[in-house]
């Protein structure tokens, strides 16, 4: 990979936390380069530094030392307001617990990031509708989270991440609350998005999930211990059926 190909470029990144007189090196000289369209799984035991790494990649935290280049821009020394702008325009986030507003429809949940950007109502509606269609949930755009299954809620969360047209999606244990079939549907969607040029960075502790990525980075004691590219397992969509067909919760609309 050449420098021109690297969408993400970490060089000797450290993150040190001070607790009284004790210093904890959560990251210790991490160097990592990721290209557009790569699907990367980040693995490691509890306390390994993988969450700190994701926070820095997501511009939620700044490194103590080293350099972080994102889309050709050095973001490691940006101020909080500048980091927030990078997050809203370049990055999308997907979380284990979905983080949907319970009294708000799927469409309105997806519109939220655009509201923060000041996008006008008509364009918000159009882009949110397109994002829901992209994840196979256009027919359920008016449903509230409690009327959706776990898999459907996670697809709403992915649509919300996509609506700002990010170059990178950061997913933190996105299948942790899903059954095995629904987890496969989410992995299929991530593989599809990677094929469209969106970079996917996925934190997981499950090897069964990591096998769908084309690259697996293992972090331990704040360092990258291994970085392996391999042929990913491809989800058989025909065997799963069309997206959006998982059942709604009991009592919810079908």
Explain the meaning of each model-derived region.
Residues 223-250:
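Conserved beta-strand-loop-alpha-helix hinge in the C-terminal portion
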Residues 5-224:
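ABC family nucleotide-binding domain
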């Amino acid at each position: 990979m050449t420098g021109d190909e690297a969408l993400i470029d970490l060089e000797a990144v450290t993150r040190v936390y001070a607790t009284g007189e004790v210093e904890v090196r959560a990251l210790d000289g991490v160097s990592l380069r990721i290209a557009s369209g790569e699907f990367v799984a980040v693995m490691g035991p509890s306390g390994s530094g993988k969450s700190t790494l994701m926070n820095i990649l997501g511009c939620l935290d700044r490194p103590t030392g080293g350099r972080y280049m994102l889309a050709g821009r050095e973001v490691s020394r940006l101020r909080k307001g500048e980091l927030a702008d990078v997050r809203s325009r370049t990055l999308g986030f997907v979380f284990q617990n979905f983080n949907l507003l319970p009294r708000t429809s799927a469409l309105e949940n997806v519109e939220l990031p655009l509201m923060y950007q000041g996008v006008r109502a008509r364009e918000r509606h159009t882009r949110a509708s397109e994002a829901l269609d992209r994840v196979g949930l256009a027919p359920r755009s008016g449903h509230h989270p409690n009327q959706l299954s776990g898999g459907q809620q996670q697809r709403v969360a992915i649509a919300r991440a996509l609506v700002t047209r990010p170059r990178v999606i950061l997913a933190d244990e996105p299948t942790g609350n899903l059954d095995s079939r629904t987890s496969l549907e989410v992995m299929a969607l991530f593989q599809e998005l990677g094929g469209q040029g969106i970079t996917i960075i996925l934190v997981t502790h499950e090897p069964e999930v990591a096998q769908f990525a084309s690259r697996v980075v293992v972090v331990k004691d704040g360092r990258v211990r291994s970085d392996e590219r391999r042929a990913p397992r491809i989800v058989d969509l025909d065997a799963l059926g069309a997206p959006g067909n998982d059942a709604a919760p009991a009592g919810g609309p079908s």
